[in-house]
UniProtKB/Swiss-Prot annotation:
Entry keyword Disulfide bond: no
Name listed for the protein in its UniProt record: Peptide chain release factor 1
Coiled coil residues, start to end: none
PANTHER family in the record: LD18447P
Signal sequence, renumbered to the chain: none
UniProt modification remark: Methylated by PrmC. Methylation increases the termination efficiency of RF1.
Protein species of origin: Nitrosomonas europaea (strain ATCC 19718 / CIP 103999 / KCTC 2705 / NBRC 14298)
HAMAP family, A to Z: Rel_fac_1 (MF_00093)
Chief location of this protein within or outside the cell: cytoplasm
Subcellular location: Cytoplasm
Cellular component GO terms held in the UniProt record: cytoplasm
Length: 359
């Protein structure tokens, strides 16, 4: 391991000792909030410090085995020990680096999932409907809730646009790599010549903002409009201005909600989407700066970036960011996304590890 990582592990080991002393004092145990905070910190750093202790012990064992190898009587035994200790060190180092990787603070959050039809006309809208069903099925498998925030259905089925809130522990960590352009290749039902058509949709995955900590908006920067809902919902759509549109004037970002009967609830939901979009814009600006010096293996997450192709005639799905092709399109479209999500997460982690070891 390089010196920077060794220094970091040394600091964490010292901090663990400090925390043990603090947590045993009456002053800390009497302050429940502080006690919980320090206990959480200890729980976070203890596993990696334990690994580092094991790493140091194996290093000592390796040094002893090397000394023994100079004695002809123990050479064969020592060389076997040296090989075993080297393997142990490699495995422990990999796990240490994995635990030192920076945690994404948004990973455990709920998300807003936005799907928009792109090129391809009616077929694109139908594909947007397929993607919505795919993510909804996946959420169902994970035990998550799906709430429709707003929708613009197509006349032929599917959606020109649909925005949903997915509520579930770890939703962002599993779906954050879905942002980007999704392309479908298939024969439309209306195609009489059997020709394959290509259509596209864009997907955006935004972590739901913390209601208190993440962002504060100046009311003077907001324009709030109410209007009559144009979608499903019953007779009330012609009687009340329950739909709400909020515009953030400094950025021009807009969010609206018309799914609920209550203007108050629609306003709250639209505000949540607006904040998520503003934060997403800030994060993507930061990522663009970082990408100028290092391009992520799993792509930039830009909405225009084509990330995946769904080829129905060949029964395959290809993720272009990691060159992964799976011949199980029916299962994936039915919500079996684990293999794809896990492969993308693993590639992202590998890129982070590579960056860490280069420092």
């Amino acid at each position: 391991m390089n010196k920077g990582i060794i220094d970091q592990l040394t600091r964490l080991s010292m901090r663990l000792g400090e925390l043990d002393k603090l947590l045993s004092t009456e002053k800390i145990t009497a302050d429940l909030d502080n006690y919980r905070k320090l206990s959480r910190e200890r729980a976070e750093i203890e596993p990696v410090t334990e690994l580092y202790r094991t790493y140091q012990q194996v290093e000592q064992d390796l040094a002893t085995a090397r000394e023994m190898s100079s004695d002809p009587q123990f050479r064969d035994f020592a060389e076997a020990e040296i090989e075993a200790d080297r393997r142990k060190l490699t495995n422990i180092e990999t796990e240490i680096l994995r635990q030192l990787l920076p945690k994404d603070p948004n990973d455990e959050r709920n998300i807003f999932l936005e799907i928009r039809a792109g090129t391809g006309g009616d077929e694109s809208a139908l594909f947007a409907g397929d993607l919505f069903r795919m993510y909804s099925r996946y959420a169902e498998r994970e035990g998550w809730q799906v709430e429709v925030v707003s929708q613009n259905p197509s006349e032929v089925g599917g959606y020109k646009e649909i925005i949903v809130r997915i509520i579930g522990h770890g939703a962002y960590s599993r779906l954050k790599f879905e942002s980007g352009g999704h392309r479908v290749q298939r024969v439309p039902a209306t195609e009489t010549q059997g020709r394959v058509h290509t259509s596209t949709c864009t997907v955006a995955v935004l972590p739901e903002a913390d209601e208190i900590a993440d962002i504060t908006l100046n009311p003077a920067d907001l324009r709030i409009d109410t209007f009559r809902a144009s979608g499903a919902g019953g007779q009330h759509i012609n009687k009340t201005d329950s739909a709400v549109r909020i515009t953030h004037l400094p950025t021009g970002i807009v969010a609206e909600c018309q799914e609920g009967r209550s203007q108050h609830k629609n306003k709250a939901q639209a505000m949540s989407v607006l904040i998520a979009r503003i934060l997403d814009k800030q994060v993507r600006a930061q990522q663009a700066e970082q990408a100028a010096t290092r391009k992520s293996l799993v792509g930039s997450g830009e909405r225009s970036e084509r990330i995946r192709t769904y080829n129905f005639p060949q029964g395959r799905i290809t993720d272009h960011r990691i060159n992964l092709t799976l011949y199980k399109i029916e299962q994936i479209i039915d919500g079996e996304l684990d293999e794809l999500c896990s492969a993308l997460a693993a590639e992202h982690q590998a890129a982070q590890l590579a960056a860490m070891t280069e420092k």
